[in-house]
Amino acid sequence: MVSFKAILTLSLIGAAFATPIEQRAAEPVEDSGAVANSPEGSGMDLGGTDPTADAIEERGLLVRNILRQLLNNKQSGLTIISSTSNAITWLSRPPRRGRSLREYPVFQQHHKVYNYNSRPKENPGPFRLIATKDSRHFCGIISHDGIGHNPNAGLFHLCK
C-alpha cells in the first residue's frame, strides 16, 4: 500500500522540475539543446524558461503519468539500485542507506504505463522515476545522458 505521504510528495513534484522534451533516436543528445550538468551541478534543464500554457499543461500530464506508473503498476520496477551506491546520493530525496531502489520509466504519452511483459521489450525512454522498492517512496527523477544516437544509454543525471 502506498502511503499518503508518498502520494502527496508525488503530487507536488510538478513544480520541482521542467517539462521533459522528447528526443528522437536520430537526434544525438549532445545536439538536442538540452543542458546537462554533472550530478554535483544543478541537474538538467529539460524545458524552456518561459512557462507557457502548453508547457504547464504538459507538466501536469507528466505528473499524472508518473503517479499512474508508480501507483497502478503491478510490477515492482525495472532494476534494483543499491541505496549505498554513490551514484544515487544526488537524488532530490535520497533514501536511507540500505534501502533497495527501483527505476520506473516515465512517459509523456497520456495514459502510458510501461508493459514489463511485452515481447519484444518496449522502449522505456531515457527518463526514470526512482522510488524505494517496498514502499515506493519517491526519491527523484533521473535521465540517461545518452550515447551517440541512443538517448536510453549512458550514465544517469538528475532532472530538475
UniProtKB/Swiss-Prot annotation:
Gene Ontology MF terms in the entry: RNA binding; RNA nuclease activity
EC top class, as a word: hydrolase
Signal peptide (from-to): 1-18
Region of interest: Disordered: 26-51
Compartments reported by the entry: Secreted
GO CC list: extracellular region
Keyword Ribosomal protein listed: no
EC number: 3.1.27.-
Entry keyword NADP: no
Active site, UniProt feature: E103 (proton acceptor), H144 (proton donor)
Keywords, ordered alphabetically: Allergen, Hydrolase, Nuclease, Secreted, Signal
InterPro entries, per the entry: Ribonuclease/ribotoxin, RNase_U2
Stated role: This purine-specific ribonuclease cleaves 28S RNA in eukaryotic ribosomes, inhibits protein synthesis, and shows antitumor activity.
Similarity comment text for this entry: Belongs to the ribonuclease U2 family.
Protein name: Ribonuclease ARB_07070
Species for this entry: Arthroderma benhamiae (strain ATCC MYA-4681 / CBS 112371) (Trichophyton mentagrophytes)
